């Protein structure tokens, strides 16, 4: 890694060092394989409606959040709902939100025309079923689900980080293959 990441918050990260680390710390609904194919991430299976506007995901019950301080919680559909709500909330100022404007009501929420985040086309049915509704079909949408902005966000963990989510070892959770044990901020060591 050439330099310290600016943030390990998937919804706000924009630099190469951050997105490289996020790919190891977080697991999204789908994964991008080295050959360019998509495989299961947190989603064990998914279906797409005939019109290409509705994606339904069945999530694994064995994906957990962890961190260097012993945080342990199951990753649920609500974590994806909250992550997408943060992505489009104007207060977040997510630099890549526009890439996901195919999601129902996302553009209107991001612009402030709709203030009710629950109107976003991302909903949970219980802990392990997630539905994403689109405004228009987007053949690239499954690929977008492998990118940093589409990663889940534990609302409990986010609130407990008190505005420092993804900015230190102690405020960066993981639901991926690795978690952050140390973060050396000195570029000369």
Residue spans for each PLM region:
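Short, well-ordered beta-strand elements
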Residues: 1-6, 54-57, 80-83, 130-132, ...
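Aromatic- and charge-enriched surface segment that lines or borders ligand/interaction sites
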Residues: 45-96, 131
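N-terminal lobe/hinge region of extracytoplasmic solute-binding protein
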Residues: 1-50, 92, 171-178
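Sec-exported extracytoplasmic/periplasmic mature domains
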Residues: 30, 34, 61-64, 85-93, ...
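Short, solvent-exposed loop/turn elements at domain surfaces
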Residues: 5-12, 37-39, 65-66, 140-143, ...
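Short Gly/aromatic-enriched secondary-structure transition segments
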Residues: 11-21, 71-80, 145-151
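Extracytoplasmic/secreted proteins, especially bacterial periplasmic and envelope-associated proteins
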Residues: 20-24, 33, 37, 41, ...
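Gly/Pro-rich hinge or "lid" segments in bacterial periplasmic/extracellular proteins
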Residues: 117-119, 127-128, 133-189
């Amino acid at each position: 890694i050439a330099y310290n990441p600016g943030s390990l918050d998937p919804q706000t990260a924009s630099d190469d060092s951050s997105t490289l680390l996020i790919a190891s710390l977080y697991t999204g609904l789908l994964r991008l394989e080295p050959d360019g194919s998509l495989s299961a991430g947190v989603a064990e299976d998914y279906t797409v409606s005939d019109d290409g506007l509705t994606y339904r995901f069945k999530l694994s019950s064995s994906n957990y959040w962890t961190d260097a301080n012993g945080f342990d919680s199951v990753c649920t559909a609500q974590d994806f709902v909250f992550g997408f709500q943060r992505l489009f909330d104007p207060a977040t100022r997510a630099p890549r939100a526009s890439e996901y404007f195919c999601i129902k009501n996302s553009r209107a929420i991001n612009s402030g025309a709709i203030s009710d985040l629950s109107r976003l086309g991302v909903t949970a049915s219980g802990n392990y079923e997630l539905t994403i509704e689109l405004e228009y079909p987007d053949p690239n949408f499954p690929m977008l689900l492998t990118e940093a902005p589409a990663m889940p966000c534990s609302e409990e963990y986010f609130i407990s980080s008190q505005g420092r989510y993804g900015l230190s070892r102690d405020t960066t959770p993981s639901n991926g293959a690795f978690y952050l044990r140390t973060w050396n901020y000195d570029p000369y060591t």
